């Protein structure tokens, strides 16, 4: 249900419509979802739509008119008022505040840029909330505890998804999904999640969890604006060699881009040929 809401940011978030999709009564839908989300369904839908529109304004320079339509607002003035209530500043003020962020995160850029076309992938996911450097270890520890005794037939593929932009989403609402190959036997408390297929810019990373969070920010705010690419409407994710979150990590970071635009310009990092990659 949350994937549906995130995929339709301009919809009203009408509880009756969403409860019909979930095949339960509006009363129970609102009660269950509000308990899970920590906020009302309408508040969640409104916040996610504004965050999504805000990200397009900050990253792609989308106009207020375009962003208001993306967020489902009938007028630019209504969108601007809602934006200020949500973020405490206007889009222009927020963009100006991010200039220092771009400069600070530049040294954290990962290396080894290449382009891959990745097949869509279904995984099992476990979610935790908070800053990535605290939510990620908690999510990975809980995920490992879910697995039944036994040796998997093949080495697992561990994938981490920081779902939100720290510059726009409050710390308590930031989502981190620890994911693993669906072919592995797992406890039923895990949920199925779909990773979007398509073109990705892929970077190599080695370092700490703190540095991994900084690397994501560097791609978003420093590499992407200069790349000549356009970000697809899908989250970036990282594929880890270590699901425990302890010590130094070796990972690949996948940044979603559109095929319809020119390939991003190479930086100082070496660019390797594109290839197909099915994640596993």
Task: Label every model-predicted segment.
Residues 14-36:
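Basic, low-complexity segments
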Residues 3, 31, 81:
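Active-site phosphate/pyrophosphate- and oxyanion-stabilizing loops and adjacent acidic/basic residues
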Residues 17, 35, 39, 43, ...:
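A solvent-exposed interaction/effector surface
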Residues 7-11:
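Short helix-capping/hinge SLiMs at alpha-helix to coil transitions
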Residues 1-4, 48-55:
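Pre-recognition alpha-helix immediately N-terminal to the DNA-recognition helix
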Residues 5, 29, 219:
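Conserved hydrophobic/aromatic pocket- or pore-lining residues that grip, position, or stack substrates
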């Amino acid at each position: 249900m949350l994937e549906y809401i995130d995929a339709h940011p301009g919809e009203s978030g009408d509880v009756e419509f969403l409860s019909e999709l979930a095949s339960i009564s509006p009363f129970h839908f609102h009660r269950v979802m509000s308990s899970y989300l920590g906020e009302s369904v309408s508040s969640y839908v409104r916040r996610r739509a504004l965050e999504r529109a805000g990200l397009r304004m900050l990253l792609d320079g989308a106009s207020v008119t375009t962003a208001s339509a993306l967020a489902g607002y009938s007028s630019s003035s209504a969108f601007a008022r809602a934006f200020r209530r949500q973020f405490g500043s206007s889009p222009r003020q927020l963009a100006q505040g991010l200039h220092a962020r771009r400069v600070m995160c530049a040294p954290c850029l990962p290396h080894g840029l290449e382009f891959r076309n990745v097949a869509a992938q279904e995984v099992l996911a476990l979610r935790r909330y908070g800053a990535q450097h605290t939510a990620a270890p908690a999510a990975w520890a809980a995920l490992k505890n879910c697995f039944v005794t036994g040796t998997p037939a093949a080495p697992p593929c561990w994938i981490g998804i920081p779902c939100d932009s720290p510059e726009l989403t409050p710390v308590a609402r930031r989502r981190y999904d620890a994911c693993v190959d669906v072919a592995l036997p797992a406890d039923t408390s895990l949920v199925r999640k779909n990773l979007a297929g398509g073109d990705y810019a892929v970077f190599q990373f080695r370092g700490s969890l703190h540095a991994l969070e900084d690397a994501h920010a560097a791609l978003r705010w420093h590499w992407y604006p200069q790349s000549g690419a356009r970000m697809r409407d899908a989250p970036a994710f990282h594929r880890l060699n270590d699901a425990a979150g302890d010590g130094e990590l070796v990972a690949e970071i996948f940044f979603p881009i559109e095929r319809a635009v020119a390939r991003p310009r190479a930086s100082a990092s070496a660019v390797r040929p594109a290839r197909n990659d099915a994640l596993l």
